[in-house]
Amino acid sequence: MFYQVLHSILSLTAVLLNAFTMYLAITKSPKIMRPCSAIITIKTATDILTSIMSFFVMQRIITDGSTILVIPTGPCINFGKTACYVGHMLMLCFLEYNLIWMISSYIFRYYILYVRQPSIKKLVFVAFCLSIPSIIHMVVWFSIYDPNEASTYLPLFGSCDMVLSGKIVYWSAITLITQLFITAFLVIVAYIWIKETLCSYATKMGAIKKDVKNFNKRLVKVINFQVFLPSFIFLGVITFASMFTGKIGYEYAQYAISVIFMFSPIISPFSYILFVPHYKNVITGKVKNPKSKPTKCNPPISTTRSTGAPFVYNI
């Protein structure tokens, strides 16, 4: 019972935080920041879907290396094993897509710095294209899943009717968890690359570009904060691997994996709320005076763009 309550609180918190961040991105972003707001909106939408699926399943994962048991305890149990399996797979899929979108957002930032701002239509198109492999992957697993497949397991793990097991559950879980680990590692690689790019860009700007350099520093703070998000994926995967290899017992580890994964969508919104000035001002109640003199935090908005200088609002 405590696990369900904790899971519900974490899921609800993640949904509310990401919904609020999405609201800020859609309604409080200036026109010049629209592409950036689209990137944030897509990421928060993915986090919301992850949280909803996590609440829907409320899964415990148990493994001894030879078998993997997924024990759902959420609302999905009212709809049967297939619904629980779909929710289990979608939650892992959304977690992976979230990491993929983080990598894409780093590439977009590079594109904004050195080329030009992508249109919102292009961003949505890219987001859709990135989702196609995951959709195909999920459809394949769903089509071959057999809820009636028999498997041996210890009765104390849970009710016979609400334990997902068998070869399909085993290999689909192994595949997605491995993909999560690889994708999280690629996020770290992309982070190192984009941070070096931003630092190099700031050096090249020179003293006359202090406003741009100031916002560039804010951008570095955003990605420095976001680099902690894959650490929750790493920790969850390591917990699973330790239980898989028998290094730790299942008594507590079965609850830890899903709970650890949930901290990623909970923490993610703060990278924007804390470091994007327009969103932070909404929280603190600051009202920007349009007649105030330009400062480092309020550079004048120009309709023209000098060569090599990005729009400073793209965080």
UniProtKB/Swiss-Prot annotation:
Annotated family: Belongs to the nematode receptor-like protein srd family.
Subcellular location, principal: membrane
Membrane-spanning parts: 6-26, 38-58, 83-103, 124-144, 174-194, 225-245, 256-276
Protein name: Serpentine receptor class delta-31
Gene giving rise to this polypeptide: srd-31
Cell compartment(s), UniProt: Membrane
PANTHER family associated with the record: SERPENTINE RECEPTOR, CLASS D (DELTA)-RELATED, SERPENTINE RECEPTOR, CLASS D DELTA
Keyword Transmembrane appears in the UniProt entry: yes
UniProt membrane topology term: Multi-pass membrane protein
